[in-house]
Amino acid sequence: MITPKVLSGFKDRLPKDAIQKAQLLAKVSVVFQSFGFVPIETPHLEYAQTLLPDTSSDIQKEIYRFKDHGDRDVALRFDLTVPLARFVSLHHQILGMPFKRYAIGNVFRGERAQKGRYREFTQCDFDFIGSESLVCDAEIIQVIIASLKALDLEDFCVSINHRKILNGICEYFRISQVNEALRIVDKLEKIGLDGVEEELKKECDLNSNTIKELLEMVQIKQNDLSHAEFFEKIAYLKDYNENLKKGIQDLERLYQLLGDLQISQNLYKIDFSIARGLGYYTGIVYETTLNEMKSLGSVCSGGRYDHLTKNFSKENLQGVGASIGIDRLIVALSEMQLLDERSTQAKVLIACMHEEYFSYANRLAESLRQSGIFSEVYPEAQKIKKPFSYANHRGHEFVAVIGEEEFKSETLSLKNMHSGMQLNCLSFLKALEIIGENDEDL
């Protein structure tokens, strides 16, 4: 006999969990659509050569890669952005530019499993392809904020940086292994200052003084300074080199655009330590954390990638986008008690006291559904205790009971499972009115 078990880093999703996830995805999908983003789908499995170019060594170690039955070198996608580059390169003449897309799907990374981190997890991506305008970057941040607010989250911060600033810092310190250095800096939250310092010494051959000054610079943060105060504070960096100058100027323009959108300044701050470990980012980058649950890591991250399609097409297409980590958000929202705890999406359970009442019960359930109320019929004529126990376990808000009197008069008795109050022999219209009201009204 096979012992039923799940691989580490993977999980089954029970009805309550699956319902919660579906509700969150529905909410963010509405936000994406409200900004004009359209859905696409790409395969879970790609040619390995599609996924590997410009991918950091850390990510490459986490990719699930193998030979398929045709002896082809294939891999499971580790994000939805690289498949997007392949997709756009293949279909750009049909799509037209600029192109705004969102995609929701599972991705796979063989990283160490821990709280909020899985080896299979769902990403919700939204991207703006085919424009280099910073208006697109501002809109992506606007969508991040709107999406989190749609999930009833208010206390969060989008930490923003620019890869040109990081490149400029590396240029200032004459670091030749730029991508390697930034990959290590990106691990600051994970391994701490000492860990980053040790890796920089080992991998980039930097001396202690250079590392100390480098880490001081990449830890520059806006914190409680106003936008104007912070840009005044870092103005001197523009004189160091063109990369730093261009990066800071882009952030100044971005902040002007976000200010025009009247987004609260508490929701976004500059943080020079934000690097994003994926090698394809070239411009503004960002990570979003919940202020009360920073240990969970970023719940939404992304940035600009101006050369992503270079591996697939002679026509270079710019892009900017972000990805919402829905599984991490579920962990956070659960701890905050902001999730629906029911194991059913049906609001009403209809219970029959006798077999001959099922035809009426089914008609009643269909009438409720046509009125927009999800309903189900308990499949057995039982003593009332059993369907009530079922409703309690699943989380139905109401139980409609069909007994002899209700059957003959074509009415129903209705019990509110939250308040415990019951009304007998209601007409369908009266029951419909009550079910549509708040539970407390019964």
From Swiss-Prot:
Family to which the UniProt record says this protein belongs: Belongs to the class-II aminoacyl-tRNA synthetase family.
EC class (word): ligase
UniProt entry keywords in alphabetical sequence: Aminoacyl-tRNA synthetase, ATP-binding, Cytoplasm, Ligase, Nucleotide-binding, Protein biosynthesis
Subunit and interaction comment: Homodimer.
Chemical reaction(s) catalysed: tRNA(His) + L-histidine + ATP = L-histidyl-tRNA(His) + AMP + diphosphate + H(+)
EC number annotated for this UniProt entry: 6.1.1.21
Principal cellular location given in the protein's record: cytoplasm
InterPro entries tied to this protein: aa-tRNA-synth_II (IPR006195), aa-tRNA-synth_II/BPL/LPL (IPR045864), Anticodon-bd (IPR004154), Anticodon-bd_dom_sf (IPR036621), His-tRNA-ligase (IPR015807), HisRS-like_core (IPR041715), HisRS/HisZ (IPR004516), HisRS_anticodon (IPR033656)
Signal sequence residues: none
Superkingdom of this protein's organism: Bacteria
Pfam families: HGTP_anticodon (PF03129), tRNA-synt_His (PF13393)
Cellular location(s): Cytoplasm
Protein name: Histidine--tRNA ligase
